[in-house]
Amino acid sequence: MSKSQSLQDPYLNALRKERVPVSIYLVNGIKLQGQIESFDAFVILLRNNISQMVYKHAVSTIVPSRNIHLSREEMGLEDEAGEEISAEYTPNAEGQAEATADPLYD
């Protein structure tokens, strides 16, 4: 599993399992809103009133509507001492994610 997948999959899966409403910003500036129904290596199924298949290559940013918590263990990552480090991201007033705990990478 590549390093980019080791963060992406657990993050999307947590959003899916917890049914967190998200805003997905596309590279062309369009904002989509809904809940992540499913995803694979290439697409995200987003559900609002209807289901939409969104190609990942068109996605710029995914912003959750509330805090989510991912531990490094869930992401398959550990620090140098082998200890678990957690990261929590909170959307700010502008809807951008801000780290509110330990950064994932130094």
UniProtKB/Swiss-Prot annotation:
One of the protein's GO biological processes: regulation of RNA stability
Renumbered residue ranges of the record's region Disordered: 78-106
CDD domains per UniProt: Hfq
Segment forming the signal sequence: none
GO CC terms, sorted: cytosol
GO molecular function: RNA binding
Disulfide bond residue pairs: none
PANTHER family: RNA-BINDING PROTEIN HFQ
Function: RNA chaperone that binds small regulatory RNA (sRNAs) and mRNAs to facilitate mRNA translational regulation in response to envelope stress, environmental stress and changes in metabolite concentrations. Also binds with high specificity to tRNAs.
NCBIfam families xref list: Hfq, PRK00395.1
Name assigned to this protein: RNA-binding protein Hfq
